[in-house]
A protein has these predicted regions:
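Bacterial N-terminal signal peptides that target proteins for export
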Residues: 1-8
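Surface-exposed repetitive/solenoidal architectures
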Residues: 23-35, 49, 58-59, 64-67, ...
């Protein structure tokens, strides 16, 4: 059936006779359908992993590539992962070693229609699938939705290849609407319609009347996804409308706790948000005084991604029920995103209100972005109203609340040497009441920083250019 199957089998046998003497093995690739195409094999030191950069990504018309497998059936337990479960700054914890010359088989996925709630729920059975929504669906009859795709605690520093239980497929909403998502109790601390997405895509989807109302610790929650991760340039949310969202959460601040609440995705590590619209409101009450970080924004919380041509209209209300420790707690809040790298041609409307108990919290609030990590914010505008009451340090910027020095050094390590805010506008004037240390900058909370030095040899410089400010 497969034109190159016999050839690969014969070649594999001949390679095996010499591999032991040479201490190398070869990985061959079978495209797993009737074709004359061929992919070059990869040579690997025997007993070592196949590096991530050696993984081929073939293309087949009408199908989506779904990974490499050790047998042509391409069952989940047969998946072969390249690289290792680590990033450039963490030690490897897991890998698949090539012990002998072998053949890997391509998995191909074709579009599958989704017409019922039951079919939507079943996509968790094939996380590489390509799904097309063909009807509007109402989820309000499900008291507590279980997210599709799971995040594991050791995912954070791993390539998306190793996010073994995340959604890695395509979900095309086809312009249809999913209404009435309900999350009333967390089954995982990364929650939404999807719990975790890794190198997957969500397109052309509308969501309305989502209700995320619960009490929990350490949540990363949003209507669409708890966490999105990409390494291949293909993780994306495009042309989606997530509107009428209500997020009401009471959470407790333990030592070193991270929380994230947004109208689209709790965190996004790489990938693209493009041509989307979000609206709604959130009410967050934070108990406990253990330190940590809080992220709140219309689109994304902890974010290192590209956001383009997105609009938001979100009311964000955050209350600290107890005083926070001095210098032990930070909150990053943005009308568009809590934190960001690259933002282009976006618009934010709405309101941000923060109230406390006169503690030592540090607040960084931006009309667009609470904390700009590294990159470029351009061509964007905010009219978000900001009000802060009874807190410690509160730094507000019309466009960005802060330029984060620590992440600026990290950006330099990635080769980004200039962080820029250009061609942006802010209309409004923040209100401070009983704030012990208020700071306001028309474009950035503390203005344009001095350049940063970097231990990697490349520093970070900052530039604010061609921005405009009006009080009303």
């Amino acid at each position: 059936m497969y034109s190159n199957r016999l050839f690969l089998s014969i070649l594999l046998c001949s390679v095996a006779l010499t591999a032991a003497a040479q201490h190398t093995s070869r990985v061959f690739f079978d495209l797993n359908y009737d074709t004359d195409q061929a992919l070059a094999p990869v040579t690997v030191t025997t007993g070592c992993m196949a590096p991530a950069e050696a993984k081929p990504y073939p293309v087949r018309e009408g199908y989506r590539f779904g990974g490499w497998y050790t047998a042509p059936e391409c069952r989940p337990e047969q998946e072969w992962r390249f690289g290792c479960n680590a990033s450039f700054y963490t030690q490897p914890t897991d890998s698949m070693c090539v012990e002998r010359s072998m053949i890997l088989y391509a998995k191909w996925v074709s579009p599958k229609p989704i017409r019922t709630v039951e079919e939507l729920d079943a996509i968790r059975e094939d996380l590489y699938g390509w799904y097309v929504l063909e009807n509007d669906l109402d989820l309000s009859g499900i008291a507590n939705w279980t997210p599709v795709g799971e995040y594991e605690g050791d995912y954070e520093f791993a390539p998306a290849e190793w996010w073994r239980h995340a959604f890695k497929g395509v979900f095309d909403g086809g312009g249809h609407t999913i209404r009435g998502l309900r999350i009333t109790e967390l089954t995982t601390d990364k929650s939404g319609l999807f719990g975790a997405i890794a190198d997957g895509e969500v397109l052309n989807l509308n969501m309305e009347d989502s209700r995320l109302v619960f009490t929990a610790e350490r949540p990363y929650v949003a209507p669409l996804a708890g966490i999105i991760k990409q390494d291949l340039g293909q993780a994306a949310v495009r042309n989606c409308r997530i509107t009428g969202t209500l997020i009401q959460v009471r959470t407790t601040n333990r030592e070193g706790t991270f929380h994230s609440f947004t109208g689209l995705c709790g965190g996004i590590w790489g990938g693209t948000l493009e041509d989307n619209t979000v609206s709604g409101r959130m009410e967050i009450e934070l108990a406990g005084s253990g330190g940590g970080e809080l992220y709140a924004g219309a689109y994304a919380g902890e974010a290192y991604n590209d956001t383009r041509r997105c609009t938001s209209d979100f009311d964000i209300d955050i209350r600290f029920a107890v005083p926070q420790p001095a210098d032990g707690f930070k909150a990053f809040i943005g009308g568009l995103q809590a934190s960001a790298t690259n933002v282009e041609d976006c618009t934010a409307r709405g309101r941000i209100r923060v109230s406390g108990e006169s503690g030592g919290e540090q607040l960084f609030i931006g009309g667009l972005v609470g904390s700009e990590r590294y990159g470029k914010v351009s061509g964007s505008a905010s009219t978000v109203k900001v009000e802060v009451r009874n807190t410690g340090f509160a730094q507000v910027g019309g466009i960005v609340g802060e330029f984060n020095a620590g992440y600026g050094v990290m950006g330099a390590a990635f080769g980004v040497t200039t962080t820029t805010v250009e061609g942006c506008s802010y209309t409004g004037k923040p209100v401070f009441r009983k704030v012990s240390r208020p700071v306001f900058g028309q474009f950035a909370g503390a203005g344009e920083p001095e350049p940063l030095a970097s231990p990697w040899g490349m520093g970070m410089s900052y530039k604010i250019d061609r921005c405009t400010y009006k009080t009303k």
